[in-house]
Swiss-Prot record:
UniProt pathway: Metabolic intermediate biosynthesis; chorismate biosynthesis; chorismate from D-erythrose 4-phosphate and phosphoenolpyruvate: step 3/7
EC number of the protein: 4.2.1.10
UniProt keyword annotations, A-Z: Amino-acid biosynthesis, Aromatic amino acid biosynthesis, Lyase
Gene transcribed to yield this protein: aroQ
Catalysed reaction equations from the record: 3-dehydroquinate = 3-dehydroshikimate + H2O
GO molecular function terms attached to this record: 3-dehydroquinate dehydratase activity
Protein name (record): 3-dehydroquinate dehydratase
Assembly description: Homododecamer.
GO terms under biological process: amino acid biosynthetic process; aromatic amino acid family biosynthetic process; chorismate biosynthetic process; quinate catabolic process
Binding positions (substrate): N76, H82, D89, I103, S104, R113
Catalytic class of the enzyme: lyase
Active site: Y24 (proton acceptor), H102 (proton donor)
Stated family: Belongs to the type-II 3-dehydroquinase family.
One Pfam family it belongs to: DHquinase_II
Length: 156
């Protein structure tokens, strides 16, 4: 049975493809989820992709990742990244290797987007790579947890 990583997307990410395409691109959430499943699969991992517009439900997803012994978490908490101590605390509480992703470069946008509570609970944070940031995040997470790309030779 494949180890599972959780890919969690927060508020408004269900609107990808139509919401501010000049900022977020034209890819949809379904495109992101396929990219994540394919990338995780390259490492023999399964991606459990979830999205919610509600902070409490995102926290429940994080707790579920812990209960199901997920190997890692990739999270794009959207606007909650900048406001949610509760999401930060949930990520810290479960102690699962986590990578934060943002499609846009949050540091090149409004001042209120420059701070991220969730980044402090992650071992890495990526922003500004578009949806390719998810692929990069899974690559980094796979390296962190020791997952090897299918067909890759393991260094001894």
């Amino acid at each position: 049975m494949a180890r599972t990583i959780y890919v969690l997307n927060g508020p408004n990410l269900n609107m990808l493809g139509t919401r501010e395409p000049e900022t977020y691109g034209r890819a949809t959430l379904a495109d992101v989820e396929k990219l994540c499943a394919d990338t995780a699969g390259d490492f023999g991992l399964a991606a459990d992709c979830r999205q919610s517009n509600r902070e409490g439900e995102l926290i429940d997803f994080i707790h579920d990742a812990h209960a199901k012994k997920a190997a890692g978490i990739v999270i794009n908490a959207g606007g909650y990244s900048h406001t949610s101590v509760a999401l930060h605390d949930a990520l810290v509480a479960v102690n699962i290797p986590t990578v934060e992703v943002h499609i846009s470069n949050i540091h090149a946008r409004e001042d209120f987007r420059h701070h991220s509570f969730t980044a402090r609970a992650a071992f890495a944070s990526l922003c500004g790579f578009g949806i390719d940031g998810y692929r990069l995040a899974i690559n980094g997470l796979a390296a962190k947890i020791g997952a090897v790309k299918s067909g890759a030779k393991v260094k001894s």
